[in-house]
Swiss-Prot record:
Record's comment describing the protein's domains: The POU domain controls nuclear translocation.
Protein name as annotated: POU domain, class 2, transcription factor 1
UniProt DNA-binding region: 395-454
Location within or outside the cell: Cytoplasm; Nucleus
Region named Disordered: 1-43, 271-295, 375-398, 532-574
Broad class of the protein's primary localization: cytoplasm
Species the sequence originates in: Xenopus tropicalis
GO function terms (MF aspect): DNA-binding transcription factor activity, RNA polymerase II-specific; sequence-specific DNA binding
Listed GO CC annotations: cytoplasm; nucleus; transcription regulator complex
InterPro entries per UniProt: HD, Homeobox_CS, Homeodomain-like_sf, Lambda_DNA-bd_dom_sf, POU, POU2F1_C, POU_dom, POU_domain_TF
Amino acid sequence: MKLHSSSKIPNHAWLSDARMNNPSETSKSSESGDGNTGTQTNGLDFQKQAVPIGAITSAQAQALLGHLHQVQLAGTSLQAAAQSLNVQTKFKEEPGEPTQAVQPSQQPSLQAAIPQTQLMVAGGPITGLTLTPAQQQLLLQQAQAQLLAAAVQHSASQQHSAAGATISASAATPMTQIPLSQPIQIAQDLQQLQQLQQQNLNLQQFVLVHPTTNLPPAQFIISQTPQGQQGLLQAQNLLTQLPQQSQANLLQSQPSITLTSQPATPTRTIAATPVQQLPQSQTTPKRIDTPSLEEPSDLEELEQFAKTFKQRRIKLGFTQGDVGLAMGKLYGNDFSQTTISRFEALNLSFKNMCKLKPLLEKWLNDAENITSDSSLSNQSVLNSPGHGMEGLNRRRKKRTSIETNIRVALEKSFLENQKPTSEEITMIADQLNMEKEVIRVWFCNRRQKEKRINPPSSGGSSSSPIKSLFSSANPLVATTPSLVTSSTATTLTVNPVLPLTSAAAITSFPVPGTTGTSSANTATVISTAPPVSSVLTSPSLSPSPSATAATSEASTASGTSTTHTTSTPLTSPLSTGQVMVTASGIHTAATALQGAAQLPTSASLAAMAAAAGLNPGLMAPSQFAAGGALFSLNPGALGSALSPALMSNSTLATIQALASSGSLPITSLDATGNLVFANAGGTPNIVTAPLFLNPQNLSLLTSNPVSLVSAASTGVTGPITSLHATTSSVDSVQNTLFTVASASGAASTTTSASKAQ
């Protein structure tokens, strides 16, 4: 075969490679006696030897076509291409027949044979590429022009030939999907090729990049004329119509070849010429499913608007619900708070956000105009039924922020009084320089918080392990002077459910006075100790042995203590005070008061102090004598003065006043020395609280306990009263009985015993 050329054609690299891998063609070329062997042998150095024009042999043409086809496949491995591709022509030649040189007069028949040539990959690995960029450009332009001219002349009559299919499809069809050992026929590619041929346009140029050659891709790019650029675009569109998967496979199968593309078009597996004068829309491939250039700007605009809308809405003081309500009244489209929230968070679809944006923008402009314009005319128009702006007129109430120091002061006030009056709230507000309404709301919220933290239970002190709730409407003791002189006495007998010892049973202690009618209200016990409960059946002041009880027992290395508590409903309460009956039987109180965490031998001390509502850690042990106990009672009054002559009873050895804050005088003692009445109802103070009784030389036996009765009148407040009772009988089993009666008519009896080792 012979190809016309108007320039020098460097061919040694291709020809030598073809001979190396195709011995038959090498022998054919050597047997041809046309005198071209000198050209072939002298073509080693392109700088010194020139190839004569029109002296290309069939082997050279085959190698050239094979090389071009390798370029069109865009980077298939050269070694694999050499093994899988071949150039076959339609010439009927014998194996041993020499190939004659094709003369210029035989060019029409050669051109007729070129379109029928099935282009397979020919030649082996191409080595020794020493072409200059100018020589490469001339070579490729010449070969492409000749092949295209032959294809244009014979495309009309041979549309279904394999050559046309190969020329059009080899540029974009990967080897992984269409085997090149068979003719390739693609109808769509043929139509595109026919259009290109009718317009006499150049096909896209493809350049091979050798894996071993580290040359920049720019040296292989051939500049084109404006006519060729249009053909390049159409050929590029032809590539994009092939399946996308095939191109992906092509990329995966060709990792060793790097090819470039023009910046305006998506990356291809081929090198394309930059086209700068053409608009982007023409170079954008049709197959790529990317959004248009306007859509990203719309997304950014929507995102920016959503952010701005939220900021301006908050600045104007509207909630998301207000916006949805106002838009429904203004524009007839009701939107929920969730919709507005999703719009601000960009959680809606692009289409819905585009629909919602103009409405929100209009509402925002109207809201800002209303805020800035204070004229009554505009307000009346917007507030008309047709322009309902109730949603716009609603403003979010500013959240009140209270400083730390003010909050601490309010907490102190709350501890003193949880329900202050209006005058007290006004005073607190003036002191803290706060609004009265803010203070009132704070106290209301604080009371609700207190209910959540400490829900109302069945009464009693939170520090006590035993809580009791009692109710009765009958008075316990008459608040008259006949309390002491009355000859009628009722005996309250307490028998423990679990007897401590045979000699420790407490039989009775007298309470002189008058009582009212009986009540059958039953005590309710909430206890952390294991309860032993039963129903109270006795309607009198003498509870049955099966009364509601709770027992706790603690043992240490030095002694064993048992506390037994019974709760008994009393039929006659005092006005608002408490009644406590106490006796001896307590030892090592100083050890007990050192801390609530440890349980000493006199475990009854902690139980009695808790039953009295007092924390044992309030006073230091150094203030008490050995074996002392501390109890607390609310101040109160009986309303009448008792005889001071009873103070000279022999059962009292020492009375000491250790506190000066407030007073709760001991106004009377009964003749037996078992009952002490405390009164703060306007009588002269005899002693101030707390009281310390030091009965070391007294007859405070287990069956005859000393007692303290404290009664408080309604509305009377005062300091805490303390009773300090000591005993020296530490070597015998002691029993102590406590009875605490509140104004509601309930009595809690605590029986404790401690045994010293």
